[in-house]
Amino acid sequence: LITLSTAIDPASEIVRDLFDALPKLAVKDPSLWGEDAKSDAQTRLGWISSPQDAAQLMPKVAALVAWAAERQLDHVVLCGMGGSSLAPEVICKNYGKEITIVDSTDPGQVRHAISDRLSRSVVVVGSKSGSTIETDSAKRAFESAFISAGLKPSDHLIIITDPDSPLEKSALADGYQVLTADPTVGGRYSALTAFGLLPSALAGVDIENLIVDAISATNALTAADSPAVTLAAILGAHEKFSPYFSVNAPHGIGDWIEQLVAESTGKFDHGLLPIVVESSESPGFKEPGTLSISINSPANANLEIQGPLGAQFVLWEWATALAARVIGVNPFDQPNVAESKTKTGLMLENTDQLSRKPDLDFGSVEIFGNSEGATLVEVLGDFFDRIPANGYLALMVF
């Protein structure tokens, strides 16, 4: 099910270590990433058996699909952030099924989703913790819209969350349909859990086919020529020289890989940052000295990976966890994500910072920060000159 175009040296120290680690990962050994990561790993390795565990989930998913069909709800809306929404979006793109994703508090995005076939919408609200502010805001917006339209929210909403979360408790009290997820699977590893499977099934995806491919791939990953070890060794060794590698992948799977790899490995001045491109002809895809990876698309890349979507999910999850061992980081925590949330909370508590005036104002463009230049062109030129050798420019679009 999975083929890689590149071989590795089986005698290398990294490869030998990864083959020693492989059977331990298969049995969910939490010691693979060191003593400091052990407590996190003990409660975050459920994804190893997610393909097999999905069989127990199928009857519940089928019942909810039937529930939506009985009510003639054929427009699927998914409210969720990050790992709660990326995988279903990729799955639906891959299978050519429509799904509306609400993964932002942008009023325009929420308003558009609410105005589109509201009476025929089944709204899936996914939050692992049950306390995600952005997702709760979207849920409240849809509840208000349903009530204003004379519709019962309980006839349209389905909740996916961890057992005993605040969201599960409130949803049951409100009479909503609830599907609980495996609490031992983190959001970015949840593609083959309730978070990935239910929204996709509601949209019409044959998730049984997806699961069969994932199970077959899992068996291949534990073999003597494991493609997970090959990919992990390449990624782990590459990180010693550069944090960046480019990915050319269809149907949005590159975006899913980006979050999985970057959030799992990026911390404490280490990690990998996938640069997702739209085609093998995109600028920078095959720059000298860079690692280029192409998925299900011939591109003459450094590494070409062939395999169905279910197999890709499993391969990248295993390879990412193993690469984190090579890099020397805990793949299951996200200190910078927590830091960002804390800083955002402080900004919201101190709204005077949000009303700060720009240092330079060019009408439609405002500049915050010190800069030498009297015109926009001069300011941008000064900014670009500050980018160090082998540095990068990040455009953060909100």
Task: Please annotate each region the language model reported.
Residues 63-222, 291-305, 346:
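Glycine-rich phosphate-binding loops that contact phosphosugars or nucleotide phosphates
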Residues 14-17, 60-63, 166, 209, ...:
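Exposed alpha-helical structural elements
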